[in-house]
């Protein structure tokens, strides 16, 4: 079995790909089936959230596997009013709902109760099968980089 042990930060020619939903992209130890049918084991550092386009490699550095975010059942909220979108984010965040936040659009795992709540605020909510890339939040690794020199702790 192929064991994928690290995320490669520099682009590499991929040898295969793996399509995973977000619930599998947050796991550091899991068995997966590559898109070419081979079995692989993820043995990655804990706290790593795999993103669409990430490249994983084995210890030998001779396999480079591209991560593809699977289409998932999501609710999609589109709104041109930043205040209403912020209000939706607040209410969903208050319920600890993982959110994908984009300009004018939110996505979360489909939930008809949450859909109805947002519709009561006058927002349009649609159902779709799309890749789901939530904000890292609780999924975030303990180590991360900042582009400034301020000292602070997390």
UniProtKB/Swiss-Prot annotation:
Pfam families membership: UreE_C, UreE_N
Entry function: Involved in urease metallocenter assembly. Binds nickel. Probably functions as a nickel donor during metallocenter assembly.
UniProtKB keywords: Chaperone, Cytoplasm, Nickel, Nickel insertion
Gene behind this protein: ureE1
Protein's GO biological process: protein folding; protein-containing complex assembly; urea metabolic process
One Gene Ontology cellular component: cytoplasm
Span of the signal peptide: none
Principal cellular location given in the protein's record: cytoplasm
Hydrolase is among the record's keywords: no
NCBIfam families listed in its UniProt record: PRK13261.1-1
Name under which the protein is recorded: Urease accessory protein UreE
Record carries keyword Chaperone: yes
Coiled coil: none
Annotated family: Belongs to the UreE family.
Compartment(s) of residence: Cytoplasm
GO MF annotations in UniProt: nickel cation binding; unfolded protein binding
